[in-house]
Amino acid sequence: MAFWTVPYRAEAVDTNRDPSMYWEDINSASTDDAHNDFFGQFVDFDADGTVTATTDNDFNTVPASMPGVPESMLLMGDRTVATLESAVSSCVSSADEFDFLSSSSRIGPTASAASHEIDPKDLTLSADELAHPSQQQFDYLGRGSMSEADLSRLESISLHSPQRPQNTTSSDTPSPKPPNTDARKPKKFVEALSSTIRKATNLRRNRKAAAVPRQVSPPQEHLQPLKIPKQRRGRGRAVTQGNLPVSPPLQQQEQATPHFIHGQCDDPFNDTALLPPGGVNLQYYGQVAPDTPVESPGVKNEPNQSHFQVDMAWQHHHHPHHHHQQQQHPPPPPHPHPHPHHHQQQQQQHQHQHQHHHQQQQHHQQQQQQQHQMHWTGTGGEYITSQEAGWWTPNMMSQGPNDFSHHQRSASVHVMGHGQHTGMPYDYGAIADTSTGGLMIHMPQPRGSQSSVVNDLTVNAQTFLPPPPPIPQAIGQKMPGSERSHRPPKAKSSGARHLSCSPVRKQRGPSSSPTPADQSAVPRSRHSSGASVSSLRSSSGRLPASMPGTPCSVRKRRSRDISGSNSATSLGGSDGASGIGFVNFTPNDGSVLMTGVAPSGSSKTKARREKEAQDRRRRLSEAAIKAVAAAGGDVDKLIEQGFAF
C-alpha cells in the first residue's frame, strides 16, 4: 500500500473568511475552523486509488473532509473511510495550490472551533463517480441546495490540477480536467507571496546599505567616544610614561579648572569622582589634605588635587576637570577627515596631559607635603568623607564657628581616618567634643576604633599643633602604593563608602607599629592604629572615660572589642579585661572559660571513667604477661624493659 503525504503551513491560511462560505444545511459546520481548512492535511492514497484526507495539526493525523470537492462527488455512505477519486488528489498536488481549498468550511458532524477532527465518513464517493471523474452534475444528495456563492465557487474550482500526475505517484486515473483555472489562482498567490518577500528583502538590504555608510562615513563619531577610555587608560599608564614637558600647561589648566564647577557636591554615590588621588600622601594632619586611602580602586591615578585651593571644589576636579580638558582637546568634530593629523596630535596631547596628571599627582603629593599653599578647610564640598584634609589647621582657628561646625560635619567623618591611613602618629591638643554636633551618630562602624581619638581631637580641635617635618619625597611616593594595598575594595552599598574611606582593619597591623612610648605619650592619637585602641584601652586607665557616651560610640566600642579582642588579649592581657566593659570571647578563650569544669559534666563521672580505664589497662597487662609466660618468655625481663601493669 503506497501513500502520499503533503505537509502544509497553517499560517498561510486566510483567516478572514466570509462566514457565508460553508455548507448551509450541515449544522455542525463551524466558520471558526476556516483557518484549519487550508489544506493542512496529509493525503494518503491506497493502492486501489482511494484517498484518505487526514488533517494534520502538529502531526496528529485525523480523518478530514476535502473542502473543495464538488457536490456531485459527495455521497453519504456507510461509516467507511472517505474514498476520493484521483481528481480530488489532483486538487492537493502541491502546497502552492492549496489556497483555493481554504475557502470552504469543514464538513462533518465533528467539526468545531476547538477541534478540526472532521470525520470524512460523512463524505464518500460512489464507485460510479470514481469511474466518471469528468461528470459535472451537482446533485446535492437529497440535502438542501447550496448557496449560489458556494455553488459558483465550486464551479469555478477545478478538481484536476495539472500538477497532480507529477506529484502523485500512486493515483490510478489521472483526470483530464482543464487545469488553467486552478493553476492560475495558486500561481497568482505564489507570485504575490514572492513579490512581498522580494520587497521585504529589498527593504532589509536597503536598510543595511544605509546603515553601513552611516557607520563608515563619520569616523570621528567613533573616535570621540573612544577618546575618553583611551585617555583614561592613558591616565592609568601615566605613572610609567613620562611626558614632563606637557605638564606645565596642565597645571595652568588645572588652576583654571577649579572654577569649572563651584559649589558643593553631595552625591553620596559618586565616590569615584570625589575621592582624592592615591598620590596625596600627606603624613601630617597640619599639612595640606592628608591622603585618605579611601580612594576607590577605579580612581587610583586621578590628577593630584594639590593644584586646587580651598575655594576649589576639588572633588569636582577629577571628572569635571577631565571632561573640561576633553572638551578642549578633542578635535573639532566637523573636520575629522580634513585634519586627521591634527586630530591625532590632539589625541596625543590629551593623552600626554592625562599622563601628566599622574606625574603631577606624584609631584604634587610632595608639593602638598612641602607647601602649605592649600589648607583644605572643607569649603571644597560638604561631602568630604574621603576628600578634605579633615584636620584642623590654623585656618580653622581663623574661621568662624559656622565654618568650624561645617568642617566638623565634613571632615570629622574622616578626621580619624587620615592619620590612621597614613600610619603616622599625630599629636593633638585638647579639643571640644564633636560628638555633640551629631557627627558621631553618622560615622560608620568600621571607623569605630577612632571614636576615642575623635573625642580627643574634638576636645582640642582648635589648638593647632605644628606638623612634624614633611617626609622625604621618596617615602611620599612609595606610600601611595602601600596605602592602596591597605585599602579594602569599595563596598557595594553607598553606606560602605565610609568603610572604604577608612580601611581601619587593614591598617591595624602596620599602624599598630608605633612604640608603646608613642602610644603612652600620645594617647589621643589612638586613631593611628586600630590595634592600639585595645592596647590603649588596656594600658591607660583614662580611656574608658575618654570614650564618647553616644550610642554610636558604644556600638563602635563593641565592634572594636569584637574585632580587636585578640589584640587586646595580646597587648593588654588580663589588665585589659578589667578596663573593658564588654569582652567578646572567642574559641581561643576556651582554656580560660573552661578551667575547673569537668568536661564530662561531673567529677564523679570523671573519676568513675578514670577508674574503669585503669582496670582495663591492668587486665590487659596481666593478660599480656600471662601470654608471655605461657610462651616461655622471661616475664621479669619484660617488666625490667618497662612493661607496667
Swiss-Prot record:
Biased composition range(s): Low complexity: 362-373, 528-546
Keyword DNA repair on entry: no
Induction of synthesis: Expression remains constant during conidiation. Expression is positively regulated by BrlA and AbaA.
Effect of a null allele: Produces fewer branches per conidiophore and thus has significantly lower conidial yields.
Keyword field: Activator, Conidiation, Sporulation, Transcription, Transcription regulation
Extent of the signal sequence: none
GO BP of this protein: conidium formation; sporulation resulting in formation of a cellular spore
Chain intervals with Polar residues compositional bias: 240-249, 509-518, 562-572
Region (Disordered): 158-187, 201-249, 284-376, 461-578, 596-618
Compositional bias segments (type: Basic residues): 315-326, 351-361
Keyword Metal-binding: no
Function: BrlA, abaA and wetA are pivotal regulators of conidiophore development and conidium maturation. They act individually and together to regulate their own expression and that of numerous other sporulation-specific genes. BrlA, abaA and wetA act together to positively regulate the expression of the Pks1 gene cluster that mediates the biosynthesis of an anthraquinone derivative pigment that contributes to conidial pigmentation that provides protection from UV radiation, heat and cold stress.
Entry's family note: Belongs to the wetA family.
Protein name according to UniProt: Developmental regulatory protein wetA
Source species of the chain: Metarhizium robertsii (strain ARSEF 23 / ATCC MYA-3075) (Metarhizium anisopliae (strain ARSEF 23))
Name of the coding gene: WetA
